[in-house]
């Protein structure tokens, strides 16, 4: 799917993506930021211009949420909020906007709920479900299971206690999360327009933990 050649919002692109999965049972949708390589006046943007590569990256992250994290397009974006937050990945942004669902008790939450916690990926969520059958988990256990505690600590409790005394407030959590530098692909950091690898799914997955 070409990104930035026309005026579609991220929400519209994500709706189309969701529709392709549901109606045509596609296994994967790919995105590519539009790059104008000549000065043809019929092209939508000038040579050398193009959408931020971070936008393409956010679409891949949201696509991952649709395919593996049981999200729906309308939960990630909406008509009132049609474009991605450039500061936070889609999963983290969703959590910040739905703090009424947090903190989550990791020793009691079901798999679906764990998937929505920033810092918990589907592998670590599966490990949590299996491990807690043997007893209650603590934060050290979670760290060993691959939970990214520097992100998750604002959204979870272990045996009713948070890792640190912290406020469950959007502004407070957002400020602290901004201090945790997001790991972005080199191409995005450089803000050039070389297309990301269609087969590098590890990067998208790691950023949704």
List each model region and its residues.
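Catalytic cores of alpha/beta
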Residues: 6-21
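C-terminal extensions
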Residues: 83-113, 139-209
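Conserved strand-turn element in the central/C-terminal portion of the radical SAM core barrel
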Residues: 1-10, 32-37, 45-53
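Residue-level signature of tetratricopeptide-repeat
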Residues: 131-132
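A glycine-rich phosphate-binding loop feature that marks nucleotide/adenosyl-phosphate handling sites
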Residues: 34-39, 75-90
């Amino acid at each position: 799917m070409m990104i930035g050649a026309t005026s579609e919002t991220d929400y519209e692109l994500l709706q189309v993506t969701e529709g392709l999965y549901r109606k045509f049972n596609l296994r994967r949708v790919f995105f590519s930021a539009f790059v104008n390589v000549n000065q043809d006046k019929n092209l939508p943007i000038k040579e050398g211009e193009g959408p931020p590569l971070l936008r393409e990256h956010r679409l891949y992250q949201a696509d991952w949420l649709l395919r593996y994290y049981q999200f729906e397009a309308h939960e990630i974006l909406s008509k009132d909020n049609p474009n991605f937050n450039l500061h936070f990945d889609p999963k983290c942004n969703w959590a910040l906007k739905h703090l009424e669902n947090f903190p989550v008790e990791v020793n009691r939450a079901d798999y679906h709920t764990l998937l929505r916690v920033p810092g918990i990926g589907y592998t670590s969520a599966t490990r949590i479900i299996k491990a807690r059958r043997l007893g209650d988990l603590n934060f050290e256990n979670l760290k060993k299971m691959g939970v990214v505690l520097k992100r998750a600590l604002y959204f979870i409790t272990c045996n009713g206690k948070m890792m640190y005394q912290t406020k469950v407030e959007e502004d407070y959590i957002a400020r602290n999360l901004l201090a945790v530098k997001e790991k972005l692909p080199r191409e995005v950091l450089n803000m050039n327009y070389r297309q990301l690898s269609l087969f590098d799914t590890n990067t998208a997955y790691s950023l949704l933990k």
